[in-house]
Curated annotation (Swiss-Prot):
Annotated residues for binding of an anthocyanidin: H19, H147, A374
Xref: InterPro entries: UDP_glucos_trans, UDP_glycos_trans_CS
Tissue localization of expression: Expressed in young cromes.
Species lineage: Eukaryota, Viridiplantae, Streptophyta, Embryophyta, Tracheophyta
Source species of the chain: Crocosmia x crocosmiiflora (Montbretia)
Protein name in the entry: Myricetin 3-O-rhamnosyltransferase UGT77B2
Leader sequence residues: none
Length: 456
């Protein structure tokens, strides 16, 4: 096929937390469905190292872009927010350079730019080269609706923490789709931490997305029809294509994975609480780890806890591992998708990032939510108050008593049984959506048509 008839698509990742992995899963699905198109995946060297180890498709290429880190390396004490700021100051020039380099290497001009929705400036990059722009929102639909409604929320409640404190329990019932959320559940970047680099980025994003031809979403029809309708009224077109975790097979087992899976094999059905807060989350505090440990011990439930070695050392209460050895297992890492799909797991204790929520839903496992930052508070509220598939932390701090209470509700009580029934129904809807003829499958076909330039 000559270069005049070939097509070239650039995918541009927001290189932090779970964002690169989500866009990469999407990229692999696109590459598998369109083997005649070349896909160039643009991300930083650091983020590329976090992607799944399995080799990509022959028509999917990894391309590195500048991350904004000074030549001498990161200054001592640089936080994740500092790294985000450095990266954003390198944009959009690094994207222009990356697209130009990809075009030279492939020998074909880019005709479509698919980006993480966070990166609103990629719309300008696409326009400059005459390509269409398709943003993918990988987080919760409720969080997206909140970000698009930033100006309304700030006008109503202000932006300073001291000003919004008195509104903490006020319902956001004046925005269709967010009526069950309280101000305390809204992402900090909207109403308190408004001057940060990330807040400015997301505010601009909320304004830019309304001009996109379509916005692809990591959700599925039937999860929340009210939010779906609200987003559909704000954007030119919405394309729910999720859950993204169902677009690809679980990663291959790593050395040591069999230990926790074998341990689960020896447990009764739905008797184990799986505890994990992700691999990219900020280091938990000693107080949080200690309170969770005490809560698990006092609750009497069986548990599998994925806790990194550096978080475990010196943070667990003295003697905890010995006292719970008969009914608990603490491991440095666990194959989460496989663990959640195991018959023995009856609850997921999570910070409630959107990936975790989707993996829990598609496994049919109710959640005990201990949110920490970003959209986690929003997700926890939706899980507990809107969908009834989990129990959320009461108050702002993790306590032993809250862990015990959530375990009793999710693992032992009648409400826990109803949660399992509700999340089981959502699991079926998610499977139907990505199945043959399902809504997400059909929307994915629409994305392919956009990528090919054949959409109406």
């Amino acid at each position: 096929m000559d270069s005049a008839s070939r097509q070239h698509v650039a995918l541009i990742a927001f290189p932090f937390a779970s964002h690169p992995g989500n866009l990469f899963a999407f990229a692999r699905a696109l590459a598998a469905a369109a083997p005649d198109i070349t896909f160039s995946f643009l991300t930083t060297t650091f983020a590329a190292a976090t992607l799944p180890p399995a080799p990509p498709a022959a028509n999917l290429r990894l391309c590195h872009v500048a991350d904004g880190v000074p030549e001498g390396g990161l200054p001592p004490g640089t936080t994740i927010h500092g790294r985000i700021g450095m990266f954003l100051r390198a944009t959009p020039g690094n994207f222009r350079d990356g697209v130009r380099a990809a075009e030279e290497e492939v020998g074909v001009k880019v005709s479509c730019v698919v980006s993480d929705a966070f990166l609103w400036m990629t719309a300008d990059v696409a326009e400059e080269i005459g390509a269409q722009w398709l943003p993918l929102w990988t987080c919760a639909p409720a969080a997206l609706l909140a970000h698009v409604s930033t100006d309304q929320l700030r006008e109503r409640f202000g932006v300073e923490k001291q000003a919004t404190a008195g509104w903490a329990d006020e319902l956001v019932d004046f925005i269709p789709g967010l009526s069950c959320l309280r101000i305390r559940d809204i992402p900090d970047e909207i109403v308190t931490n408004w001057h940060s680099d990330l807040s400015i980025l997301l505010h601009r994003m909320g304004n830019q997305l309304t001009s996109a031809t379509a916005v692809a979403l990591n959700t599925f029809d039937g999860l929340d029809t009210t939010i779906d309708a609200a987003l559909a009224s704000l954007f030119k077109k919405t394309l729910p294509i999720g859950p993204l975790n169902l677009l690809s097979s679980p990663p291959p087992l790593q050395p040591g994975d069999e230990k926790c899976l074998s341990w689960l094999d020896g447990q009764e059905d739905a008797t184990v609480a799986y505890v994990s807060f992700g691999t990219m989350v900020l280091m938990p505090t000693q107080s949080d780890v200690s309170e969770i440990a005490q809560g698990l011990e006092s609750s009497g439930v069986r548990f599998l806890w994925s806790l990194r070695e550096e978080a475990r050392a010196g943070l667990l209460p003295p003697g905890f591992l010995e006292r719970t050895a008969g009914r608990g297992l603490v491991v440095p890492w666990a194959p989460q998708v496989r663990v959640l799909g195991h018959r023995a797991v009856g609850a997921f204790v999570t910070h409630c990032g959107w990936n975790a929520v989707m993996e829990s839903v598609t496994s049919g496992v109710p959640m005990a939510c201990l949110p920490s930052f970003a959209d986690q508070k929003t997700n926890a509220r939706m899980v507990s108050a809107a969908w009834g598939i989990g129990e959320a932390l009461r108050g702002e701090k993790v306590t032993k008593e809250e862990v015990v209470r959530s375990m009793e509700i999710v693992m032992m009580g009648e409400e826990g049984r109803r949660m399992r029934e509700r999340i089981g129904n959502l699991r079926e809807k998610a499977a139907e959506a990505v199945g043959p003829g399902g809504s997400s499958s059909e929307n994915f076909k629409s994305v392919l048509e956009m990528v090919r330039g054949t959409a109406n």
